Amino acid sequence: MDFIAVYNPAVYAKEADSEAWRQLLLYHSFKEDAEEPTPQNEKLSLIGMIQGIWQFAHNFSEPETRGSVRYVDTQLERRRVIAVEVEDGHFMAFGVEDGKRYGCEYYVRELLQSYHVFRLHCGSMSEFADRGELTDRLNEHVVGYWQALKLVPEAIYASTLASVCWHDGYKVSELELRDRAWESYIKNEILLDSESFLGLKDMCIYKLPRDGRRSAAEYGLLRSFAPEFLSLPELSNWVYHLDRLFETALSSHVLAGHVRLSIGGDEQEEEGELRHDSQPASDVGARMWRNVTMPISMTYDTMSEVGNLTGINTLMSGLNSLTSGFSSMTSRLVRRADRQNSDTASLSLHVDHGFLISPLALEALPESYRYRRFQLRFSTDEPQWYRLLFWYYKDYLCIFIFHENFDKIWDPDYLQAIDAKLYDAMLQLEGSVVTEDNKPGRFAYGVFNKTTKRIECSLPLLRFSDKRSDEKSRQPLKMVVAGIDETLQFLTAGTFATNMATSRTNDEHMGPSATNTLRMPEPTDAPSSSWTLDITKLNLFQGLNENLRLEKMADTDSGTFLDSLSSEKLLQLNVELCRLYTGIRRSEYNKAGIQEEQLLRLNNGILFYISTSPTEDVLILKNWFMDDKYTKAENKRSTSASLLHSLGGDVRRWWNARTNREQ
């Protein structure tokens, strides 16, 4: 990476030559070995060249293409520069030296997503009256976004065709369910509840499978309830971005925005860093704290069996907010709403659900641990600011979107009631999931609805940690918690490990020389799914056991035929698919209102079906060699004029089922 810049040339047109620097809102160089900072004249000269190329390119563009993303991709001296218009008059430019191995779609997607992250947190650039404040916010969010990608550039390229070329859409989960009773329960008991009706704008529920490469078709947004949620793609892609970077370490720290990636060796640990074994840096202090709290914990367990002693429970709740990592003092939330006032409530020692971000967090923590403030847009209304709370159940992540002036979220009883109701809904959801032992599919698909922006995709999710595993020379990455003083780091050390563990692909001992896998380590005193704490703590989204990862990656009895490919082969395949699809899409401007089908054969023998229309794009990859001679004969006898039907009975059955489901 060379640089990232944000500029507004319209400002320069209004100012004298001596004020030309005002058009440059942000310029960040990634060249850490540079002896001197880039001179201001050199920055302005670069922006001037980019803008000149931009005007030359787009003055001759067809009017029909104006509705799409406007960008330029050019080579300037030693570097490749991609510039995108993110707002009217505001541009973002990115310089990189990649030998043009990857299509510009990869970088256009990241530029737009970094802008969308900025807009979620700060609003539109045009809303800023103070240039200095705008630059500060760009440094915080845009530079932070790209700095993380600089440490793990594999995250840019380890993306499917769907996420790269359909960056304005959002991935939906295709989890197969027997019924939708859980949806009705959420609507009636939470959304339409008298206490929530005026304040709760929407709920978004995501399925984020934690099993190895994950089931690609099941990954994504399972349900949102508000009609015409126009910011849903930006919010969903923000969640997916955090998940791809931090993977199984998606926690309260990450969602609150207080974690940054850092390259770590065997040198002295950085300030704010926690050890990968979930132990604080001071082992003596940790043992002392355990000795102090253990008698209180045992007393609490005994008294809980007697009954619901309100005064004592209130006191112990305060102690619970200070101690973390002890199963006897955590997970104290009654799971069902009708048990809240029961004198004989059975309290579980392990609760696999709870709030990640909510006002129930420690008061000493920063505000972002109690709620996230995002600017979102619903229907045709102007964007407004909302408060977001985060809740999880196993590998489901739920986002509550509240109006900013709704003060009920500060009521602990209200939040605990929501927690109990949503837990009941998740039990209903889990009971309705259809579990079948499917054989590997002979085809993979991607469908993009241009009206709703929904993406259905079964292309394997390529994890960049797989690609890093062959690069033993790379230094391990650490996750550093920032913005929390040493006392809180100590008190919350049991909830979050900042060192990404390292492991080999065989049974050798784990150590610093092992290959990197970006995952959270498994605690030795808890089951593989128990990285959870009570809602008064800093919660960690359900983790992943390394043995499960290796087993799932080697298992080809589910998913599609592409799951058996290596990460390097998947990467090459996605780059080629992006190149082919982009070339076809660029010629759409003169084919308005026409549906076009194409069937291509790749060099590896895979058939690539592409259908483009004004409302929907459909992509299908088919392994023709997996069809037996009877299936091929059946395909030849097909009388349909559609190329899709010539791909085989399995593709036809999937397409017909999908069509019937949408009707």
From Swiss-Prot:
Residues 503-529 are annotated as: Disordered. It comes from Eremothecium gossypii (strain ATCC 10895 / CBS 109.51 / FGSC 9923 / NRRL Y-1056). It is found in: Endosome, Multivesicular body membrane; Prevacuolar compartment membrane; Vacuole membrane; Vesicle. GO terms for biological process: autophagy; protein transport; vesicle-mediated transport. It is a peripheral membrane protein. Keywords: Autophagy, Endosome, Membrane, Protein transport, Transport, Vacuole. Belongs to the CCZ1 family. Forms a complex with MON1. This is Vacuolar fusion protein CCZ1. In complex with MON1, is required for multiple vacuole delivery pathways including the cytoplasm to vacuole transport (Cvt), autophagy, pexophagy and endocytosis. The MON1-CCZ1 complex acts at the fusion of vesicles with the vacuole, through its regulation of the SNARE complex during the coordinated priming and docking stages of fusion, and particularly at the stage of tethering/docking. One of its GO terms (cellular component) is Mon1-Ccz1 complex.
